[in-house]
Amino acid sequence: MVALEMLAVGLWMLLDPHDSRRYRLFGLVWLVCLYGLICRAVLHFEDIAFPIKLDGSLYALDKALGLTSFPLGRLLLHGWMGAVISEIYAALLPVIVVWFALSLIVWHESGIIWALLIEMVAAPCMYALVPACGPAYAFGNFPADPLLTIPASMRLSADPNAMPSIHVATALLLLLFARGRFWKGFALFFLAGTIISTLASGEHYVMDVIIAVPVACFVAATLEKRARAAVVYGSVVLAWMITIRTGPELLIGAPMALRLSALLTLMLGAIYGCFRKNSGALPWVPYGGPQARMVPEQNG
């Protein structure tokens, strides 16, 4: 799908070689593809550097939370529903390209572009802090529940890209930076589908999805120069990940405290989504051409 979008953007660029927006979009599509290759190499390195994964701790946290991805997988990973789940999970990159095009051509701002660049840099660092692969890779019988006692850590050979769910964080960023009712509605639908697909496919634990919410809010707050909000959401992310890395038994042994903490984390995300303003939107600086113009920052 991304290859078709790249071809379409290339042809569109040739129709008006003086429109700088077309070159930017073409470059961004290439950047997305290049990042995919680089990220795969980095994850392979992290897999070798961190052979012991924390999937057992994340599974135990999900159990203590009272929500795991296994029942959802058993419900949806069959027949046409399984195919739909797979397609939704794979649709993230094409949707990102669409958002890049909308940002350049329709919304005249670069907020989502810079947000995803920040996320791209931060993702491998977070993966290294809590290396985990996802239930589909840690438990060979997924979506059937594990029959044996699961150790807190285990030796696995798979990409440690579970914690946090960058798929969900990215889908939430698409919603935060969407403009217009239609695209906000589409982004909300895509976010819901992404959450369901990441869990049902066994790519992520429930805790991965929960922590993805403050990750997205941290990126958005940083980009929009909301220092206090960025500190709050960044601290929430670090607190979760450091606790999971160093003392998950503290949360596992106190399920009520775990559930309350998870609920407060999601509420913080909802607060940011409901009350943020768009004053931090960053317009593209024009380079000339018939469409080049400064676009005033949007308020409200």
Can you annotate each of these PLM segments?
Residues 24-29, 97-129, 187, 191:
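Interfacial segments of alpha-helical transmembrane regions
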Residues 189-225:
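Membrane-water interface signatures at transmembrane helix termini and the short loops
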Residues 40-56, 119-143:
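Transmembrane alpha-helix/helix-exit interface in multi-pass inner-membrane proteins
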Residues 235-297:
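Transmembrane helical bundles and short interhelical boundary loops of multi-pass, membrane-embedded
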Residues 125-181:
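Membrane-interfacial catalytic/cofactor-binding modules of polytopic membrane enzymes
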Residues 81-96, 157-179, 206, 210:
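Membrane-interface loop-to-helix entry segments
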Residues 99-103, 168-184, 214-223:
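Membrane-interfacial alpha-helical segments at the cytosolic side of multi-pass membrane proteins
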Residues 1-4, 22-96, 286-300:
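N-terminal transmembrane-helix/juxtamembrane module of multi-pass inner/ER membrane proteins
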